[in-house]
Design a protein with these regions (language model features):
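Hydrophobic alpha-helical
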Residues: 110-125, 195, 213-277
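An alpha-beta-alpha
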Residues: 51, 55-57, 70-72, 157-203, ...
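Hinge/cleft segment of the Venus flytrap/periplasmic-binding protein
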Residues: 12, 25-43, 47, 178-182, ...
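Extracytoplasmic "Venus flytrap"
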Residues: 32-43, 48-69, 73, 82-93, ...
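Hydrophobic alpha-helical segments within soluble ligand-binding/sensing domains
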Residues: 93, 146-173, 220-222, 270-275, ...
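C-terminal motif of bacterial Sec signal peptides marking the signal peptidase cleavage site
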Residues: 20-24
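Short beta-strand elements at the ligand-binding edges of bilobed clamshell
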Residues: 83-85, 138-163, 178, 280-296
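Flexible loop/hinge segments that line or gate small-molecule binding clefts
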Residues: 116-152, 168, 174, 271-284
Length: 345
């Protein structure tokens, strides 16, 4: 079994390799100043534009949905999309970004693998090519980021869950939490804290019995939930920091009499399978809430910015450091506004 400390050490080792690749005998790129325009000059026709999309992973449906939406946009507008996923490895991601640049990328969209560990790497990359971050950014680098307000999304979901428990006559609950991987230094912690803040704001006290990584994947979330429930069968809530892990937890407790009083919620994502459970269960269902985190909205905005820069409509300095997609909690009372069975995600 790999411990948290072991995973962290492995991540740090990988980042040291990346740093050596960048810095060893000098920097790959001669300046730290951010790129002021497209890497290969302004393209008058969008069909001449090449966009590199460096995704951190594809294991979770949320990230896979980003790829689907990005490919749809590229087909609709006619630009070339170079898409690579790094399996959460910063060294792999660096190599992929360099490969995209050598293949003629004018701009990059990047979902970073490590908020803290990629600063030097991304400073240098962003000096050569305009970088728009999506979902996870490296603060202080790149031209802008498009992401979810994870703290607010988590809080809104937590408030909905708090109200459900209060409706059941409970103002104090025990819970277990399904977390992200060791490299999840920003998104997951914000989702976690936001949800807990929402419980508090909603008038519910909580006790965290256990936390375990589900790697943002349903199958691993299911295993982690089984492990935690084995020692804590009487908890009130399984919280997943995304719907995929929460769905894994749902699979563990659904239909099992010993877990009749165990409910499930997610901090974020709004995955259609989770929304279907919220809709079918109604206000007495086992899957209580989640938060809107649309991969399509994020991809739309990140690619809009990238194309505007690549075609000279705007320059990198025109954009704020960060912008956020719509933040809202989703529960039984507003499910019809957000559930689309035909959605990509």
């Amino acid at each position: 079994m790999t411990t948290g400390r072991g995973r962290t050490a492995a991540v740090l080792a990988a980042l040291l390799v990346a740093a050596a690749a960048l810095g060893g005998c000098g920097k790959i790129y001669p300046t730290d100043e951010p790129a002021s325009g497209p890497a290969n000059g302004v393209k008058a026709d969008v069909q001449d534009v090449v966009v590199g999309f460096a995704q951190q992973q594809l294991q979770a449906p949320y990230f896979a949905a980003m790829q689907v939406r990005a490919e749809q946009i590229a087909q609709e507008q006619g630009f070339t999309l170079l898409f690579q996923a790094a399996n959460k490895d910063p060294v792999v991601q660096m190599n992929q970004m360099q490969a995209m640049m050598s293949q003629g990328a004018d701009v990059l969209v990047v979902n970073a693998t490590s908020v803290k560990g990629q600063f030097e790497m991304m400073t240098q990359v962003a000096s050569k090519i305009p970088v728009t971050y999506i979902d996870t950014s490296v603060p202080g680098t790149g031209m802008t980021s498009v992401q979810s307000d994870n703290l607010t999304i988590g809080r809104e979901s937590g408030k909905i869950t708090a109200q459900r428990f209060r409706d059941m006559g409970k103002d104090s609950i025990s819970m277990v939490i399904l977390t992200g991987p060791a490299t999840d230094e920003f998104v997951g912690p914000n989702r976690r804290q936001g949800f807990l803040d929402g419980l508090t704001e909603g008038g519910v006290e909580y006790e965290i019995r256990a936390e375990q990584s589900g790697e943002y994947a349903q199958d691993k979330g299911q295993v982690a939930a089984e492990n935690m429930l084995a020692g804590n069968p009487d908890v009130d809530l399984i919280l997943g920091l995304n719907d995929s892990m929460a769905l894994g937890g749902y699979n563990v407790v659904n239909g099992k009499p010993q877990y009749d009083s165990v409910y499930v919620a997610a901090s974020a994502d709004g995955q259609k399978e989770a929304l279907a459970l919220i809709k079918s269960g109604g206000c007495d269902g086992k899957y209580i809430s989640t938060g809107l985190n649309s991969p399509s909205l994020a991809a739309d905005e990140a690619l809009r910015i990238s194309i505007e820069v690549a075609t000279g409509q705007r320059v990198p300095a025109d954009f704020p450091a960060e912008s956020f997609t719509k933040a809202v909690g989703i529960g039984c009372e507003n499910i019809d506004e957000y559930y689309d069975p035909n959605s990509v995600f």
